Amino acid sequence: KATVLSPDGEMISERERRETPYPCTPDVLLEELRLLAATQPAYDRVSVGFPGAIRQGRVRDVTAFVRPAPGEPRDPKLVEQWFGFDLQSALADAFGKPVRVANDADVQGCAVIKGEGMELVITLGTGVGCAVFYDGALLPHMELSHGRFGEGLSIEVACGDNERHKVGKQEWRKRVHSALKAFEDMVLPDHLYIGGGNAKRLEESELGPNRTIVPNVSGLLGGIALWERTGDANASPIAHDHDTESAPAPAGG
């Protein structure tokens, strides 16, 4: 998805969406993002939400893209292409603009947290994303959803979209509630935010206290806050032009 935002977070273009093609190599992803950007009006800087772990702009892990298709085993050739790939520099070269890239849950979290104590953001989509903030600062990204869930499954797989289709709505909801409890036991957050495309499939009345469902559009709106909340641990800016006060756009991932 992509849009252009004003400095105060107002969308000044329609959201454009493209399905992720598989197999998705770095070159394929860059081309898809270029095509998304071409649908948008002029912009001054770029924020990208990526479905994997990013350290210093480089890919540390990306469960989704190292598989030929969702649900298939990892492909060693795709793992080799993605591990250590300097995505941030590649994006800066592609767009010729200042760029920040971070995990997509980190980006969404930047838009929804209050900056009070320990805050945990969980995104439910193709897989499961996680972001942790303390007093408004984004902590180094951790793939908490890689933890085990029952026999032979990770939390990311058990609560992901493929399994939702296999097991049905009620079983999927039970799994998600179990996973949320496990995350809370590990992180001890003061508040838990739940976003992503499948968050709407939960009943907010069943969530209990200190849990909030947030709109999926916050994944785009977080593109602005990403520049304010991130440090060197997860994302660092690469500038090819002078940075301006204009909105970071497009945001995609």
Feature locations, PLM:
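Short beta-strand scaffold segments in enzyme catalytic cores
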Residues: K1-S6, C110, V128-Y134
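Glycine-rich phosphate-binding loop and adjoining helix at the ATP-binding site
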Residues: E19-R34, A38, D44-R45, A53-V112, ...
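Short glycine-aspartate micro-motif
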Residues: R45-S47, E119-T123, Y193
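Anionic-ligand binding region
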Residues: G117-L120, T126-R148
